[in-house]
Amino acid sequence: MTRAMRRHALPCVLIALSCCVAVTAGPRMPAQAAAPVESYRVVNVYPHDPTAFTQGLIYREGFLFESTGIRGQSSLRKVKLETGEVVVQRRAGLETHFAEGLAEWKGQLFQLTWQSKVALVYDLASFAPRGTFAYSGEGWGLTHDERRFILSDGSSRLRFFDSMTFREIGQVEVTDQGRPVTDLNELEYVNGQVWANVWHTDRIARISPETGRVIGWIDLGGLMSGGFKLDSEAVLNVIAYDAPGRRLFVTGKLWPRLFEIEVIPRARE
């Protein structure tokens, strides 16, 4: 190429590049605002079985119903809130399972298993077995929004299942500021939102089930303090909501305490 050709070629290259920029550049999408972080106030403290590897918890009819894990030790329990006393316990049928999340629907309890790919169904009043439902992948957390079951599997997904057949009918990815939120664990449906404990953290994500967007965070740091020596796996793990009483309960694996808390705006620093 001659010097003259190079001189004429350079403006052509610049024009071509400017055209490419003009074509590829478009209107910028507005960035999502950071989800607000809230704090908490302890309202009441109740005793909790420190040997319970708690994986699921719900509040119904004045009692706590608890799913505990560890293969060979898994159980389903009915517990007195005020004393922590286990008044009913079932282990039969769970010998080979690692029990996980727990939900109630129309007088029946649905207990997930971690890797067995089956949900066990019981009568709420008697704990008598009422069947099973199969699902793919792992089971971590479970709740119900009066229309469908909502399941977490440790990823950034919430999966939706039909209430009658337990057939998967959809899913949504959970994001905060456009980034996936992984390790979604135990779930609770609270006033139109899915609240999810994020595994091995002290935070609860408040999630829109329609969009998957994190609406807010609850920071429970320092909740289990007071000199207790806990196992490395003794992490915050479950949420239970008393809808009629508007009370919120949280505890963890192997925790000796269960807390009733009130969510409050975080103090500005």
Q: What is the predicted function of each stretch?
A:
Residues 33-51, 81-88:
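A short helix->beta-strand "capping" segment at the edge of beta-propeller domains
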Residues 43-75, 91-103, 252-254:
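Beta-strand-rich domains and repeat architectures in extracellular enzymes and scaffolds
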Residues 45-50, 90-95, 131-136, 173-179, ...:
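Surface loop/turn motifs at the tips and blade-to-blade linkers of beta-strand repeat domains
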Residues 54, 184, 231-241:
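Signature of short aromatic-glycine-proline-rich micro-motifs recurring in repeat-based ectodomains
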Residues 61-62, 106-107, 146-147, 191-192, ...:
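Short coil/turn segments that connect the beta-strands within blades of beta-propeller domains
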Residues 66-71, 109-116, 151-155, 196-200, ...:
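Conserved beta-strand positions in repeat-built beta-propeller and related beta-rich domains
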Residues 80-84, 123-127, 163-166, 208-212, ...:
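Short loop/turn segments that connect beta-strands within beta-propeller blades
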Residues 84-121, 128-139:
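Blade-loop segments of beta-propeller domains
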